[in-house]
Amino acid sequence: VRFDDDAGLDTSEVQDLRGSGGGGGGIGGRVALGGGGLGVVGLIIYFVLSQLGGVSIGGGSGSALSGGLGSVGSGQQIDNSRLESECKTGADANKNHDCAIVAIVNSVQDYWKQQFARSGSTYRPAPTKFFNGGVRTGCGSATSDTGPFYCPADSDVYIDLSFFDELKTRFGARGGLFTEAYVLAHEYGHHVQNLLGTSRKGTGTGPTSGSVRLELQADCYAGVWANHASTTPTESGKPLITDVTQDDVASALDTASRIGDDYIQEKLGGGQVDRSKFTHGTSAQRKKWFTTGFQTGEPARCDTFGTSNLG
């Protein structure tokens, strides 16, 4: 994925909580934080750790990660000075990782602003917050082990960019910038669900649960954005992203295959797969729904709650 060198970046859509604004490195699903946070892999990781004698996970949306995390990182003060000075154009995004994340956030939100407008609604932007180590949110406290997540209580996306390194080393994903784009687009899919009132359906565990359907829909929404990424204009009238290659799509699908419930439970949980604990869907399902969104480019095709065939 590459960015138009001349396109402007909007750093106001990202808030840097990393203290002095230092650099980071870069996945997301459903995490049950104090107020019902939604992340790509967080709850799975904590389920696996609990099975291995690590943390204890409670039931429901109000108990899993809000307590017992020990001290979380400081740096709750927003300091965007570095982003503002370094991330001005697409040319900056092509050479600076933090700026690339800003560009991806801009592109995803530009798409949803325009999609909501086409349907006669108004999209309310949500900031992505960079943090290191730990963070306090409207959904409770979380550490970087949670993975990237969306908090409906404050309508923010949270990400410790170093988690993408763990995605490669611990989960075996191939990585790459479009992997990170897929994760961010997935989290913004949760924001869309929150705006549309769909988030409340994401309850329970198991292969056909509302939780799984919510996550697969967010994967599909990520695919929809990917379909439109190189054609969605910014305020200047030109798309921020110039192209999405087949290799980009392959990296997203590879990531989806590494964050399915079955893959993570088997890889990190000693080979045991408990379908009753599924919260995100299998690797095959996650690939299927991202592909559905990418191939159709239509949010309406992401109705995971209206189908008996999740894949």
Please state what every model-predicted region is.
Residues 165-182, 206-212:
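Short pre-active-site segment immediately N-terminal to the catalytic Zn-binding motif
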Residues 112, 159, 182-195, 219, ...:
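Active-site recognition of the HExxH zinc-binding catalytic motif
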Residues 260-311:
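Pan-zinc metallopeptidase signature
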Residues 103-105, 109-111, 115-116, 217-264:
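Short helix/loop segments within enzyme catalytic domains
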Residues 1-86:
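Long amphipathic alpha-helical segments used for membrane anchoring, targeting, substrate engagement
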Residues 58, 134-160:
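Catalytic zinc-binding patch centered on the HExxH motif and its immediate surroundings
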Residues 87-110, 117-140, 239-247:
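Acidic helix-start/capping segments at beta-turn-to-alpha-helix junctions
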Residues 194-216:
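Post-HEXXH active-site segment of zinc metalloproteases
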